[in-house]
Structure formats: C-alpha cells, structure tokens
C-alpha cells in the first residue's frame, strides 16, 4: 500500500498495523499476515523476485527500483524501515513506473538472463532494461537498452510477465487521462473498459515448449523445477501447494536423492525442493540444514529466509541464526540479523550482538541499527547508545 493509508487487520496472531507506505506478506496456509516492509514509499507499483528468492520493488514516484531485504526488519509502529539504495542510474530514472519483471527465458538471448525490466507510463512511455549484478552484500545495475519505446501519448505500460512459451506479455492500460490529481476522477475521457496486450518475441530464437503444469503428475512437476524459466518454476510451486502434503513430501525426498550432485545447478534444484516443502507448511529440516551450509552464498541466504519464517517448526531456529549471522558473506549475515529482528528481545539481542563481530558495510549499517532498535524496544533515533553497549 502507498502513503497516506493506515491499515489495521485482525488476524489469529494478533492485530497487524501499518501506516503509510510498505508491503504486506500473507501466508494462506497459516493465515499469517505481516507487515514485511514499512517504507517511506508513495506508490509501490511493482514487485519481483529473482531466481534466489530475493525481492525487489519499484518505488513508482521516486522512480527508483530497490532491494527489499534491507527494509524488511521489523519496525516500531509509525517508524519506517531503510529503503536502501536505488539500483537505477540517475539518467535512466523515469517516472512514474509500473510493473517489474526479471528476464528468465530461453527464448531471449543468453546474455540478458537476469536483467530486470521496468515500465514508465508518462514521461518515457516504454520499457527499460537494466543489467543487475552482485556487488558485495548488495547489487549494482547498468542500463542495457530501451526495450520498448512508443510515440503514442496514450501508451501506458503497467505490467508484464513471461508466458509459458518464453515470450513476454505486456499490458497497456492505454488511456488518454492518467493521474489522480491532474484530472477529475469522473472525467468522461477516462476509459475503464479498453486496453491492449502486447506479446514480445525474439524472432531468431525458438519459443520454449510450455511445461505441463495443470494436470501434471507430482513427478512431472518436480522435474519441471529444473527448468531455467523462473515463471515456470513459480507456477509449478503454486500447483504443488495445491496438492496433498502427504502425497508430495515423500516424492520430494526421492527426487532430491536422485539429483546429480556434480551438476552446476544442484544446489538451486535442492533449494526449489526446500521451497516446495515450505509452501506446504512442512519444511524439510534436513534440506534446510543442508542448504544453510551450501557452497553458494545465494543459496545460504535463501535458506536463512526460509529459516526466518519457519521458527514455529524449527526448534533450533535461534541457534541456526546465530551461526548464519557470522557467515563469511554479508548478504547471508544481513538475512540473519533481519530475521532476528522479528524474534523476542531475549532471543534477538544475543544474535544481533554476534553480527558486530564482522564489519557492517553501507548496505547493512542502517538495517542493523533498526533491527537493534526494535529488539531493544527503543526509538531508532536513540539507538546509538544501545549499539555502543553491544560492542
């Protein structure tokens, strides 16, 4: 939700309160709702996940694109988290944005896989494509190209998603009028019934053969988790969440046992399996422990995120977070202390103290301050004294 909004939701776990901008996360299996990020953001009109489960959001009016994890520490009501840094070069900041998607399709060239796409609906009227690469704890980006540009002043690209055949579908709201301030809300020129759908293909490359998802066997679905396309794997996991856990879990165990450990994507395949068990609210703790010690820090960070949300099942959650918060990679450590910020004070503070055994870079310092402030029950503006006491 955007700025100027105030939300209070009664849940089985207590009232969830939010004020001004931010994001909610709902687990339908547990009926669990949380204010996953409370940020100073006018209009959050775009959210996307990369292949490792890291989430990013478009700020719209900013018009920045940011990594969400630094801002997902638990906050005191009315206090915002740290938005962190924009990931778009200044000369390519165009507003307002709407829609965010990562390129993950064999139909598109190999060298653009992992790029992110972001739309603009007024000034630029098109879709920009940016490279995204790791940069220590966080990320950096570089503009690659303007993938779509229109001279039609009514062109309003608002969302996009890769289809099962690897093509890119783009939704054009196509409206003469746009904005809630510039024109009367009941202006007859506002079109509520028409729009356009564009399909973007790469002519020199073949389309992807769509994987069978609906009506597929559990074995077929699990094998689909090896496919390169993120959106296919996303749809497969959604389908598996609708199956009976008693039917899926034994097959997940068997599927993982047959994986080739020498395969380059082995750890990612196991991560997909872990996500399936998490989605069924029956997290496989053997897989979780395995991936917390993975060679790839992307996988370790993803495993810590799973650990964050499964404390109701993983009894040694605090001990595992205490180990992760001293990981050699900053992204894993930050996942761990962000997770700790959601725990009770007596559990959280010892974990946060361990995080000080390692340097806090510019991606980590502000989220760490906020994590300590919340766990200590003090205003973040007064946290400097508390931080000194942890040294």
Regions found by a protein language model. Name each.
Residues 1-207, 211-223, 230, 237, ...:
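Beta-propeller blade termini and top-face loops
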């Amino acid at each position: 939700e955007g700025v100027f909004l105030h939300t209070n939701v009664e849940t089985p776990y207590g009232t969830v309160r939010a004020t001004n901008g931010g994001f909610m996360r709902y687990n339908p299996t547990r009926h669990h709702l949380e204010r996953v990020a409370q940020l100073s953001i006018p209009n959050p009109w775009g959210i996307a996940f990369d292949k490792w489960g890291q989430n990013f959001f478009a700020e719209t009016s900013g018009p920045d694109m940011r990594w969400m994890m630094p801002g997902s520490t638990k906050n005191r009501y009315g206090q915002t988290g740290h938005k962190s840094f924009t990931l778009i070069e200044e000369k390519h900041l165009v507003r307002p944005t709407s829609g965010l998607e990562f390129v993950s399709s064999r139909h598109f060239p190999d060298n653009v896989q992992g790029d992110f796409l972001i739309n603009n609906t007024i000034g630029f009227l098109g879709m920009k494509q940016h490279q995204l690469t790791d940069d220590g704890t966080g990320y950096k980006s570089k503009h690659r190209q303007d993938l779509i540009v229109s001279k039609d002043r009514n062109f309003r690209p608002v969302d996009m998603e890769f289809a099962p055949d690897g093509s890119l579908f783009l939704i054009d709201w196509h409206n003469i009028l746009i904005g809630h301030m510039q024109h009367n809300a009941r202006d007859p020129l506002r079109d509520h019934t028409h729009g356009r759908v564009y399909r973007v293909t790469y002519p020199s490359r073949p389309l992807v053969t769509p994987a069978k998802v609906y009506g597929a066997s559990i074995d077929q679905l699990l094998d689909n988790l090896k496919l390169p396309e993120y959106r296919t794997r996303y749809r497969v996991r959604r389908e598996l969440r609708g199956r009976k856990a008693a039917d899926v879990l034994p097959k997940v165990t068997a599927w993982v046992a047959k994986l080739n450990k020498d395969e380059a994507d082995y750890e990612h395949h196991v991560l997909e399996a872990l996500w399936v068990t998490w989605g069924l609210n029956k997290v496989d703790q053997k897989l979780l422990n395995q991936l917390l010690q993975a060679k790839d820090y992307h996988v370790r960070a993803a495993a810590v995120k799973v650990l964050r949300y499964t404390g109701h099942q993983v009894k040694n959650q605090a001990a595992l977070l205490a180990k992760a918060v001293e990981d050699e990679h900053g992204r894993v450590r930050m996942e761990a202390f962000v997770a700790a910020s959601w725990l009770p004070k007596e559990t959280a503070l010892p974990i946060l103290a361990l995080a000080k055994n390692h340097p806090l870079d510019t991606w980590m310092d502000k989220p760490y301050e906020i994590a300590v402030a919340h766990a200590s029950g003090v205003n973040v503006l007064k946290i400097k004294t508390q931080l000194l006491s942890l040294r």
